[in-house]
Amino acid sequence: MVSAFGLMGLLHTRKRSEEDTDVTRRVGDRIGKLWDIAHQGMRENRFLRAEKALLTILKIDEKNAPAYNRLGILYAKQKEYRDAIDCFEIASSIEATPSSLHNLGLIYYETENYERAGIAFEQALKLEENMAARHVAYAKVSEKLGNEKLMFSALERAIELEPNKETYSLLQKAYVERGMEAEADMIGEKLKKLIVPAGKPKRILRPRRVVI
């Protein structure tokens, strides 16, 4: 009798486990389809359709950081910056990634909130330091904040990571704008002789705008 009850309990547990697995699979399939709709809507500039799909994902999984990140990009495209900032802040609080923090910094920069932009770019750099575009963004906001030392340091680091015409030209421009002709001429000479090393990009690699 005891063994019969034990067997029934085992079967019941196994049935519950199978049911849970089936529910998880169905939810996963639904979220996958919603992502397809969201991506298609973004590609076709059908923003309302994409927004509805992303909001539905967040109803199912309220801690889905990639969905908040993508929703932030959608709002930014429509210049709804306050909503974009909210989304990127939530995404970063759930899962701080270089992409979500960089996106947050870009929106703060766009809305002229340079101090917060600088903080966001710094946090992104702590997580991913080896991308020139992140240093260029940090250089731009440092310039706005009047910190030329940080600006030049960031531009020089960008050149170390990706020594190409674009990174050198940005540093040269910064020198010219400050009347630092000798330094600008030195960069000009380097540009004339520049040979981009094998395996290095010829233009600045831009960060992915979202991680899924």
Model-derived features: where do they sit?
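Long, contiguous interaction/recruitment modules in multidomain scaffold/adaptor proteins
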Residues: M1-K33
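Alpha-helical segment of the N-proximal tetratricopeptide repeat
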Residues: V23-D83, S93
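Short coil turns that delineate tetratricopeptide repeat
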Residues: E62, E95-A96, E129, E162-P163, ...
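TPR alpha-solenoid repeat register
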Residues: A67, S100-L101, R134, T167-Y168, ...
